């Protein structure tokens, strides 16, 4: 399993190439076993977790690559404290269909395209040569040999020790059967076809109705097997403790061979693991999504924990006591983790490491930013944010500094998860793992209206009073020309419907601007209402398309165009250097009509770019 980072994961304010930390990859193992049924049990209680006290932790990093500044600079000092008060038809001509013995059909289509309009132009990225394709085949076969799928004897699994541990390990190794794909499909055969193809556009017709789309289950434990968090409430704490013990034992079996357990497949269920010593995280899902999607969600859970307990605190705690209990430090954070999990299920900005700012008039955004320009006396001020309706209005940052989208996701999630943060002035110590995982910054949070808030992030833990005085000055500027009331009026206008594009047959789309590292999408409408099976199916399809254009499942190369069609809908992803576009249309639309719809959406977003994206954010 290989994982490739997003081409650009910084905000428009500066070019950052770093994304969520990739899991170290050595040899990987894929395991499917009847005895893993314990991992699929829904019977486990919720462990409540959260912060109590944080000590000052100087940064141990000699250099911060995200901010291009020495870690010892004033802006990077990490301090902690407690809170104080168209020729479209020509594109899809001459297609050929290739069948295999699974339920999946692959339709390869030429010619390749990578231009601003889907019209079969010649401006495109060259495809791999035959030699590179052969190399990709050999690499895929090598990866296949490293994957193991096992069906063991039924019954309960006891925690292994000594010879029993070796016996379980040998059972896993030798009980290899024919490899079957996730959700009943030969996904490795399909992945090999994706790797070997010399075309840029493929049509994948898959059967996804077998997925039941049960709520995903998330677990966090220590490397000693102690429970830290589980995402659902069940009556017996013993059940979750035993479950964590089984997971810890399975992870340890492969760790003995310097290997990392990445996932287990059992029927339609997938159990994905993320190992971030001293914490282990895993998730159980039957949605049929690519493995990297679950691992990315686990990454965000890990980052949310680090926002409360920095990596330095965590390591020191477990160095002193290997079986330490995190429940005291994490007491009260369960709402933060639960809200993060809920948002990550359907919010595409998590998968793409982007933001979706408030849709508003460009002039109003510029006026707001001008009122937020800080005085020069704030030497340790890092970021200034204006938030409305849970979305960013504008962000100001120091020159040569930047902020990673995942850090902003953590901040916005923390604010959204606590009503207290939105009703009183707050001085919040928080760790931004992408900024500095070793220590804390401090955020002054004040909601000047019910749904409009100011956030000032500083490295100076003593700056509360100064920032409080400055907030009053900013508020006065925003009220002088009624900017504040106009921002409040823009909040209900932020959502828009698919009819705004004016394209018959178009049901939904997601547009990612690579330049601005932001996305836009209409609201979910029928038949994709919030929480419906149709919405879950479509989100999973988008995730598969994202996987294909980023080659995150071992493909030899990334694709530029991928089209998935089922009896319910047809979806197309179009990846270019400036943007990625995901559209959903009626399955009855012709191929030329689908291409025309993609062009229409791209043109509409270009015309609305000033309103839907935050461009040219000010610096100080």
UniProtKB/Swiss-Prot annotation:
Chain spans, region Disordered: 1-165
Principal location listed in the UniProt entry: membrane
Subcellular location: Endosome, Multivesicular body membrane; Prevacuolar compartment membrane; Vacuole membrane
Keywords: Autophagy, Endosome, Membrane, Protein transport, Transport, Vacuole
Membrane topology: Peripheral membrane protein
Domain of life: Eukaryota
Parts forming coiled coils: none
Example of a GO biological process term: protein targeting to vacuole
Record's compositionally biased regions (Low complexity): 73-90
InterPro entries: FUZ/MON1/HPS1_longin_1, FUZ/MON1/HPS1_longin_2, FUZ/MON1/HPS1_longin_3, Mon1
Biased composition (Basic and acidic residues): 93-102, 135-148
Polar residues bias spans: 1-33, 41-58, 123-132
Family in the record: Belongs to the MON1/SAND family.
Function comment: In complex with CCZ1, is required for multiple vacuole delivery pathways including the cytoplasm to vacuole transport (Cvt), autophagy, pexophagy and endocytosis. The MON1-CCZ1 complex acts at the fusion of vesicles with the vacuole, through its regulation of the SNARE complex during the coordinated priming and docking stages of fusion, and particularly at the stage of tethering/docking.
Name used for this protein in its record: Vacuolar fusion protein MON1
Gene: MON1
């Amino acid at each position: 399993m290989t994982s490739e980072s997003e081409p650009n994961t910084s905000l428009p304010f500066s070019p950052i190439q770093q994304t969520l930390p990739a899991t170290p990859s050595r040899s990987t193992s894929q395991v499917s076993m009847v005895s893993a049924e314990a991992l699929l049990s829904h019977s486990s209680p919720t462990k409540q977790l959260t912060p109590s006290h944080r000590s000052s932790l100087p940064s141990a990093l000699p250099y911060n690559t995200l901010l291009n500044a020495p870690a010892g600079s004033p802006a990077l000092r990490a301090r902690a404290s407690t809170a104080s008060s168209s020729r479209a038809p020509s594109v899809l001509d001459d297609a050929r269909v290739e069948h295999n013995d699974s339920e999946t059909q692959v339709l390869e289509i030429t010619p390749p395209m990578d231009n601003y309009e889907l019209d079969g132009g010649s401006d495109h990225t060259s495809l791999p040569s035959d030699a590179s394709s052969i190399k990709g085949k050999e690499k895929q076969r090598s990866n296949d040999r490293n994957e193991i799928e096992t069906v063991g004897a039924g019954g309960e699994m006891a925690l292994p020790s000594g010879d029993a541990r070796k016996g379980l390990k040998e059972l896993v190794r030798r009980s290899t059967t024919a490899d079957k794909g996730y959700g009943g499909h030969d996904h490795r055969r399909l992945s090999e076809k994706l790797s070997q193809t010399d075309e840029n556009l493929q049509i994948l017709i898959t059967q996804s109705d077998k997925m039941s789309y049960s709520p995903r289950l998330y677990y966090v434990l220590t490397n000693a097997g102690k429970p830290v968090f589980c995402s659902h409430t069940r009556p017996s704490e013993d059940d979750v403790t035993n479950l964590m013990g089984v997971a810890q034992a399975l992870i340890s079996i492969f760790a003995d061979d310097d290997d990392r357990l990445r996932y287990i497949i059992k029927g339609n269920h997938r159990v994905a693991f993320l190992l971030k010593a001293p914490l282990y995280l895993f998730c159980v899902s039957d949605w049929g999504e690519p493995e990297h999607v679950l691992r990315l969600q686990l990454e965000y859970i890990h980052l949310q924990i680090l926002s409360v307990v920095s990596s330095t605190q965590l390591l020191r705690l477990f160095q002193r006591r290997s079986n330490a209990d995190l429940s005291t430090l994490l007491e009260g954070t369960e709402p933060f983790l639960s809200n993060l999990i809920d948002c990550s299920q359907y919010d595409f900005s998590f998968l793409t490491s982007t933001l979706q700012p408030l849709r508003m008039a460009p002039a109003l955004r510029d006026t707001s930013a001008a009122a937020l320009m800080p005085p020069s006396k704030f030497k340790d001020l890092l970021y200034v944010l204006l938030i409305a309706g849970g979305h960013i209005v504008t962000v100001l940052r120091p020159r040569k500094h930047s902020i990673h989208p995942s850090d902003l996701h953590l901040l916005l999630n923390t604010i959204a998860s606590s009503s207290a943060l939105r009703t009183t002035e707050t001085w919040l110590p928080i760790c931004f793992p992408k900024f500095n995982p070793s220590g804390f910054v401090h955020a002054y949070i004040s909601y000047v209206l019910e749904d409009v808030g100011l956030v000032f992030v500083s490295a100076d833990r003593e700056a509360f009073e100064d920032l409080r005085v400055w907030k009053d000055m900013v508020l006065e500027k925003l009220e002088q020309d009624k900017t504040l009331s106009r921002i409040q009026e823009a909040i209900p206008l932020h959502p828009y419907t698919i009819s705004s594009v004016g394209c018959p047959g178009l049901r939904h789309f997601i547009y990612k601007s690579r330049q601005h590292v932001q996305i836009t999408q209409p609201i979910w409408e029928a038949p994709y209402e919030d929480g419906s099976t149709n919405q879950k199916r479509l989100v999973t399809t988008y995730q598969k398309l994202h996987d294909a254009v980023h080659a995150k499942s071992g493909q030899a190369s990334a694709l530029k165009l991928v089209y998935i069609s089922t009896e319910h809908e047809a979806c197309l992803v179009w990846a270019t250097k400036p943007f990625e576009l995901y559209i959903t249309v009626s399955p009855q639309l012709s191929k030329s009509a689908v291409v025309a719809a993609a062009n229409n959406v791209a043109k509409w977003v270009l015309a609305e770019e000033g309103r839907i994206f935050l461009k040219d954010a000010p610096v100080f």
